[in-house]
Amino acid sequence: MRYACIQRHRGEFEVLLMCRVLEVTRSGFYAWLKSVPSAWARTEERLRVEVRAVYEMSRGRYGSPRVHAELQARGERVGRKRVARLMSQEGLRGKKRRRFKVTTNSSHTYPVAPNVLDRKFDVDEAGVPDQVWAADITYVPTREGWLYLAIVLDLASRLVVGWSMGETLESSLAIDALNMAIQRRRPAAGLLHHSDRGVQYASNDYRALLEGKQAVVSMSRKGNCWDNAVAESFFATVEIELIQDEDWHTRNEARGAIFEFVEVWYNRQRRHSSLKYQTPAEFDKRLWEAARAPLPKAA
């Protein structure tokens, strides 16, 4: 198109001269120029599409920091403030965290361990996986009744290495999650295992399993949920990004959704703020590569 040719070369030749050569009017060229979206406007529109695609990929869970991180991971050069502005203009808002609820019962006669972990939660990029695990239990409402979820989380990468679901809060629920973690990760002796003082974690069977793996047992102080803040934070994420928007009729419906959330979304796709917006699986892989050790293989 002649107008487009003039636009491409207007820095080299006078507009009037090019209009005469191409037999178009100067007023016609400038009218065309006003009707053509600027490069900035075209970029804005493309970014709007990309931002919405990432937001929808997250099922409406991501706020602007994680949308920005995902766009950068895809090779998009864009500032966080621009992403936040575009999301605001499009009415896209991430889900906000609510206060979490205590589920385990610490009223029992089993012995409890001291708080060895002592809130040392910081992620160390030079660290080694499977040095510290945190365990906890939450409950999930369905129309059929409660479904309970127990998890074991690796503190180095925030990866959920073991989990179990059941209809009761018996010790076997926590034991099944721990067994999964052990089979998947094969931790070395000296693993530090932290939990609250719930009866499931203080029980003889659970403690025997830890002792058999030569693990060091650590427990939160009585009534202090902040001593197990990483596990509590994971459950707050589950609640805000999954549970609060669902109305499951059966426990089996909830089981399927929770499995997908933990294994597919949280471990492998969700970008974690404390991991510099990498996924737990990505961060875990980097830690193993830095340690020059093979990734653990399940039995």
Which stretches of residues belong to each language-model region?
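Charged DNA-binding/catalytic regions of mobile-element recombinases
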Residues: 1-299
